[in-house]
């Protein structure tokens, strides 16, 4: 009894009363009336155990106090002692009655409420409602289901809305599941399959009407499903990231440059593995679509094409890397050669620097010797500065004397200032005149520069003309046509601008008589053109004869091509024979691969059997865990019943003890009366004898 009360008190001390205020069951008046007798017995039992184990009000154990010690010495004293004990019991009963009721309530709560979440608490409900609302809104629940969602709806739900939310959340966990029309019957089985840890708090009859007093249970169930969905999304994101990282790692490894032949072999194996992986993924995706009764295999084919494009890109990058490696090695070789040349030059520079360092050392030594002479020079300079300061003082005194002399003569400083102002005006006018003259000279220079530029451009065009004529004469001389280029040249003196032409240069001044463009050069160019046309006609006649020869050569080529075609037919027949032999070899390889695939299927089947056995074992473990929990619950119930039986026995024994004590007191009173009567009789007999 003492151990059970101590465990109950321990549990009560470790509970947070502010967290579970809404979960404490409040007893009704009928229940209090029904439990009145049991509560009285329980309080008596607790009071007696406290009186036995501790001193009242202190908590000191009474192991060292003699329990059999009595305070009464006479019958009257005995009645007073029992009355005091009864008064103490009645006083302590009121102080401990609330503790015993709270212990009963906590024990009943521990047995009945298996869900540790404070689902009845309004603050907790609002928190999980906000979390459910945020998850549904984030994942576009209202768009996918065409059903509005709000916090108010989660506080006052409908049966239809609950079913829509439940279906949406479960389909995110199991997208291939098909719901029937009577979903209320399926919800319980789905929760059982999901292993909802607080399934015992939900009945099948409550699922048909979730919006009543049991809504807090279903709200907690929806919150649990939201949490599982969040965890599943996190796991899937991790898997996707790992796959992406794996692919990127393979691509980065394959894009790295090669160093040894072993790395080349490893890369070849990775290429083969990549191709096998692409084909396996294509087969699995197409098989999944086949199981789903879908005839559209284009997405998987597109993925296969993209995969092969990436594979080709990787191979191209590998080729490019090899090319870059070769280029880099060649560049390194060139750099090494340059470095060797630099080493030679640096050696020569080192020798030169060594000689320079010797010169600098000599210079430093000379400067050290000169630095020893500088203190004397500085003293001389100080003495000279003192002399100059004395001269400045003398000049200042002279200036003051001159001012005095001018004042005596009547000449003021204002006259000097006026003359200085006139002087400044004259200097300004001179500056303006100089600026205008500079502008005129600059304009003349700019015009002269423009004329020089025009003349230079003319000379450049003449040079281009001369170079084109030289090229023409060379090309014509190569063709066997000699051209006199002296008659086609234009001669202009380059010292033409040195003369002073204030009114410009005329055409006659540029080109003297007999050497102008229209007079002599144009005629010679037309004559040369006529000669070229005559030569073209003769060349065309020669070309006609050459074309006839070419036709004869083409006829010979056609005959030889026919011979080549016959040889190619023979070669194609040989290739067809080779391909037939190759196909037979491939057929044998395919048969061997089929046998390998059969063995792999057997291995996969054995793996599946192992997985099913493992899952069955896990289910057995979970079922045994559930049975263990049920046994624990039954054990707690039996413990509670035994607790009540012990309380009942203690109540009966306490009543029996009280009755015995009252009967003993009555018998003691009767014995006292009898003894007094006997004493009176003895006294009377003695008195009679004496008389």
Curated annotation (Swiss-Prot):
One of its GO terms (cellular component) is Ndc80 complex. It holds the Pfam family DUF5595. Residues 1-95 are annotated as: Disordered. GO terms for biological process: attachment of mitotic spindle microtubules to kinetochore; cell division; chromosome segregation; mitotic sister chromatid biorientation; protein localization to kinetochore. Acts as a component of the essential kinetochore-associated NDC80 complex, which is involved in chromosome segregation and spindle checkpoint activity. Gene3D superfamilies: 6.10.250.1950, Ncd80 complex, Ncd80 subunit. It is found in: Nucleus; Chromosome, Centromere, Kinetochore. Residues 376-446, 522-686 form a coiled coil. Present with 1160 molecules/cell in log phase SD medium. Component of the NDC80 complex, which consists of NDC80, NUF2, SPC24 and SPC25. The NDC80 complex is formed by two subcomplexes, NDC80-NUF2 and SPC24-SPC25, which are joined end-to-end through their coiled-coil domains. It has a rod-like structure with a length of 570 Angstroms and globular domains at either end. The NDC80-NUF2 globular domains are probably directed to microtubules, the SPC24-SPC25 globular domains to the centromere. NDC80 probably interacts with SMC1 and SMC2. Also interacts with KIN3. Interacts with DMC1. Residues 20-42 have a biased composition (Polar residues). The modification Phosphothreonine is found at residues 38, 248. Residues 54-65 have a biased composition (Low complexity). The gene is NDC80. This is Kinetochore protein NDC80. One of its GO terms (molecular function) is identical protein binding. Belongs to the NDC80/HEC1 family. The keyword Phosphoprotein applies. Residues 10-19 have a biased composition (Basic and acidic residues).
């Amino acid at each position: 009894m003492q151990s059970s009360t101590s465990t109950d008190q321990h549990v009560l001390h470790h509970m947070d009363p502010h967290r579970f205020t809404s979960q404490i069951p409040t007893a009704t008046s009928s229940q209090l009336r029904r439990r009145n007798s049991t509560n009285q017995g329980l309080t008596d039992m607790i009071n007696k155990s406290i009186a036995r184990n501790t001193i009242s009000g202190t908590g000191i154990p009474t192991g060292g106090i003699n329990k059999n010690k009595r305070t009464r010495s006479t019958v009257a004293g005995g009645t007073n002692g029992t009355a005091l004990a009864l008064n103490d019991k009645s006083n302590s009963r009121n102080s401990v009655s609330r503790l015993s009721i709270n212990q009963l309530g906590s024990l009943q709560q521990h047995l009945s409420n298996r869900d540790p979440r404070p689902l009845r608490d309004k603050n907790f409900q609002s928190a999980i409602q906000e979390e459910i609302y945020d998850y549904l809104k984030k994942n576009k629940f209202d768009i996918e289901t065409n059903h509005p969602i709000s916090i108010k709806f989660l506080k006052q739900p409908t049966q239809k809305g609950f079913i829509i939310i439940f279906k949406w959340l479960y389909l995110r966990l199991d997208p291939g599941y098909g719901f029937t029309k009577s979903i209320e019957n399926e919800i319980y089985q789905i929760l059982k399959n999901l292993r909802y840890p607080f399934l015992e708090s939900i009945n099948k009859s409550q699922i048909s009407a979730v919006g009543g007093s049991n809504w807090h249970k279903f709200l907690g169930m929806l919150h649990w499903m939201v949490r599982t969905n969040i965890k599943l999304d996190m796991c899937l994101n991790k898997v996707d990231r790992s796959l992406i990282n794996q692919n990127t790692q393979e691509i980065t490894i394959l894009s790295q440059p090669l160093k040894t032949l072993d790395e080349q072999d490893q890369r070849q194996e990775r290429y083969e593995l990549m191709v096998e992986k692409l084909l396996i993924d294509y087969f699995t995706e197409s098989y999944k679509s086949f199981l789903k009764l879908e005839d559209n295999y284009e997405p998987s084919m597109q993925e296969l094409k993209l995969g092969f494009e990436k594979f080709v890109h990787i191979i191209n990058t590998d080729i490019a890397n090899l090319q870059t490696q070769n280029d880099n090695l060649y560049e390194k070789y060139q750099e090494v050669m340059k470095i060797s040349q630099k080493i030679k030059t640096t050696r020569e520079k080192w020798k030169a620097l060594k000689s320079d360092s010797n010169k600098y050392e000599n210079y430093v030594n000379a400067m050290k010797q000169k630095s020893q002479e500088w203190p004397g020079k500085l003293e001389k300079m100080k003495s000279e500065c003192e002399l100059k300061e004395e001269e400045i003082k003398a000049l200042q005194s002279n200036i003051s004397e001159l001012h005095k002399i001018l004042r005596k003569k009547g000449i003021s400083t204002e006259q000097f200032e006026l003359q200085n102002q006139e002087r400044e005006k004259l200097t300004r006018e001179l500056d303006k005149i100089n600026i205008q003259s500079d502008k005129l000279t600059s304009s003349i220079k700019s015009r002269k520069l423009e004329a020089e530029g025009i003349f230079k451009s003319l000379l450049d065009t003449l040079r281009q003309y001369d170079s084109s004529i030289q090229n023409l004469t060379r090309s014509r001389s190569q063709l066997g046509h000699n051209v006199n280029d002296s008659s086609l040249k234009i001669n202009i003196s380059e010292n033409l601008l040195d003369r002073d032409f204030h009114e410009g240069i005329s055409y006659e001044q540029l080109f003297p008589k007999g050497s102008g463009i229209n007079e002599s050069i144009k005629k010679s160019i037309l004559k040369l053109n006529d000669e070229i046309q005559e030569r073209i006609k003769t060349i065309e006649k020669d070309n006609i004869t050459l074309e006839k020869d070419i036709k004869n050569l083409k006829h010979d080529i056609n005959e030889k091509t026919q011979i080549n075609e016959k040889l190619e037919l023979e070669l194609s027949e040989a290739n067809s024979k080779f391909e037939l032999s190759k196909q037979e070899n491939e057929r044998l390889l395919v048969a061997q691969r089929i046998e390998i695939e059969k063995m792999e299927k057997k291995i996969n089947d054995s793996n599946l059997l192992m997985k099913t056995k493992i899952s069955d074992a896990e289910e057995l473990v979970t079922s045994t865990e559930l049975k263990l929990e049920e046994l624990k619950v039954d054990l707690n119930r039996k413990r509670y019943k035994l607790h009540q039986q012990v309380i009942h026995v203690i109540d009966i024994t306490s009543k029996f003890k009280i009755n015995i004590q009252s009967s003993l007191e009555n018998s003691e009173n009767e014995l006292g009366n009898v003894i007094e009567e006997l004493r009176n009789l003895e006294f009377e007999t003695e008195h009679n004898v004496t008389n």
